C-alpha cells in the first residue's frame, strides 16, 4: 500500500524560506532556458545538469563523439558566469598535467604554483576512460575533496567546482573502464543521445539564422550566487516518509540476486540532496516522491554491478532500477 504523509507539514517553511527557494527556482529556470537556446531538444538533460550543479555533484556523460557534450558544458559555464576548462584525456596524460606543478621563478628565487586546468569552476574531462588509472584517480580525488595536493601542499579548488566527465562506450578500442569505486563518485550518469529529425533540422536552422558557428550566451548568474543557491537547498524540507522511500529504493538495489554490488550509502545521500535540488527548481520548499523518481535512474543505475551471467543476458543496472521504482510503494501526498 502507498504510504501517506502530510504535505502541509512538509511544505510548512516560513516566508523567508519560500522566498529563497523562489529565487533559486527563477535563476535555475532562466539558466535552463538560456542553455536551451543552444542545446536543442535535450530539456531533461539540461534539468539533470542543473540538478547536479545545485547539488554540487559531478556528472558522467557516456556518448559517442560529436553529440554536444563540450557545447553543453561550455554553455552552462557561460550562463553561470563560471570559469571553464576542458582537458582531453589521453593515455600519456600525467596527474601533474591536470593538477599543476611548482616552477622555479628566477626573478624572485622562489617556487611558484603553475596551476593546472583543475583550477576552474566547470571542468570538462573529455574521454576520461582514455587516461591511465593514475590520472583518473587524481581527477576523482579532486572531485571528491574539492582540493588537490601538489608536492605536499594542499590547495582548495574554486567554488563551485563541478566536473562533467565524458567517456566513450567501453567496447571502443583504447579505453580504460572506470573502476566501480570511481563510478560511485559520480552523482549522475547520463547520455545525450542523437537528436531526432526535427531537432537536427532545428539545429541547422538556428545555425543558418546565426550566421556564425559561435553562440551568444547571456550570463544568468555568478559563481558566488551558485554557491549561495547550493547552500539554500538545506532549507528544503524532506519528510521522514520520503527518507524511508529513499532507503527502501537503495536497500532493494542490494537484494537482487542478479547483482554483485548494489547502491552504496553514497547513493542514498545523493538521492537525498538531489531531490532537494529538483524540488527547488520546481519552486517547492519540500520534496515529493516525484522528485526522487525523476532522478533515481541517473543517480543509482551506474552504481550497480551485475553478475557476469546477467550481463550476458543484457541486464543492466537501469533494468534493476526500473523494476525497483515500479515496485516500491510511493508515499502519497495528502493535503493538510
Regions found by a protein language model. Give the residues of each.
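Conserved alpha-helical scaffold flanking the Walker A/P-loop in AAA+ ATPase domains
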Residues: 47-51, 104-124
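C-terminal engagement/docking regions of AAA+ P-loop ATPases
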Residues: 2-18, 255-336
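Conserved AAA+ ATPase core "coupling" helix
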Residues: 95, 99, 175-248
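Pre-Walker A (pre-P-loop) alpha-helix and adjacent loop at the N terminus of AAA/AAA+ ATPase modules
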Residues: 20-67, 247
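AAA+/SF3 P-loop NTPase mechanochemical coupling elements
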Residues: 112-121, 150-167, 178-188, 266
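Conserved AAA+/SF3 P-loop NTPase catalytic/coupling segment centered on the Walker-B
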Residues: 96, 117-144, 158, 173-183, ...
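Walker A/P-loop
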Residues: 53-90
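Conserved catalytic/switch belt of AAA+ P-loop NTPases
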Residues: 52, 134-156, 162-164, 168
Amino acid at each position: 500500500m502507498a504510504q501517506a504523509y502530510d504535505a502541509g507539514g512538509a511544505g510548512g517553511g516560513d516566508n523567508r524560506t519560500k522566498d529563497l527557494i523562489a529565487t533559486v527556482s527563477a535563476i535555475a529556470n532562466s539558466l535552463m532556458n538560456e542553455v536551451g537556446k543552444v542545446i536543442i531538444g535535450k530539456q531533461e538533460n539540461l534539468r539533470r545538469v542543473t540538478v547536479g550543479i545545485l547539488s554540487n555533484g559531478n556528472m558522467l556523460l557516456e556518448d559517442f563523439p560529436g553529440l554536444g557534450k563540450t557545447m553543453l558544458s561550455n554553455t552552462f559555464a557561460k550562463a553561470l558566469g563560471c570559469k571553464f576548462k576542458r582537458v582531453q584525456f589521453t593515455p600519456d596524460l600525467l596527474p601533474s598535467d591536470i593538477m599543476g606543478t611548482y616552477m622555479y621563478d628566477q626573478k624572485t628565487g622562489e617556487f611558484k604554483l603553475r596551476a593546472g586546468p583543475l583550477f576552474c569552476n566547470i571542468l570538462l574531462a573529455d574521454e576520461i576512460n582514455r587516461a591511465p588509472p593514475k590520472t583518473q584517480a587524481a581527477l576523482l580525488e579532486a572531485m571528491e575533496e574539492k582540493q588537490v595536493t601538489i608536492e605536499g601542499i594542499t590547495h582548495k579548488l574554486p567554488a563551485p567546482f563541478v566536473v562533467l566527465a565524458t567517456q566513450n562506450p567501453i567496447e571502443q578500442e583504447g579505453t580504460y573502464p572506470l573502476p566501480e569505486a570511481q563510478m560511485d563518485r559520480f552523482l549522475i550518469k547520463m547520455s545525450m543521445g542523437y537528436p531526432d529529425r526535427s531537432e537536427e533540422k532545428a539545429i541547422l536552422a538556428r545555425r543558418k539564422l546565426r550566421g556564425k558557428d559561435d553562440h551568444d550566451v547571456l550570463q544568468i548568474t555568478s559563481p558566488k550566487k551558485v554557491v549561495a543557491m547550493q547552500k539554500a537547498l538545506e532549507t528544503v524540507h524532506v519528510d521522514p516518509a520520503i527518507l524511508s522511500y529513499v532507503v527502501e529504493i537503495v536497500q532493494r538495489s542490494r537484494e537482487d540476486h542478479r547483482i554483485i554490488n548494489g547502491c552504496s550509502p553514497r547513493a542514498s545521500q545523493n538521492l537525498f540532496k538531489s531531490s532537494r535540488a529538483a524540488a527547488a527548481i520546481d519552486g517547492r520548499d519540500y520534496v515529493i516522491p516525484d522528485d526522487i523518481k525523476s532522478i533515481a535512474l541517473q543517480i543509482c543505475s551506474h552504481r550497480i554491478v551485475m553478475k557476469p551471467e546477467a550481463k550476458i543476458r543484457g541486464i543492466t543496472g537501469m533494468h534493476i532500477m526500473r523494476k525497483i521504482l515500479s515496485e516500491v510503494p510511493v508515499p502519497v501526498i495528502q493535503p493538510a
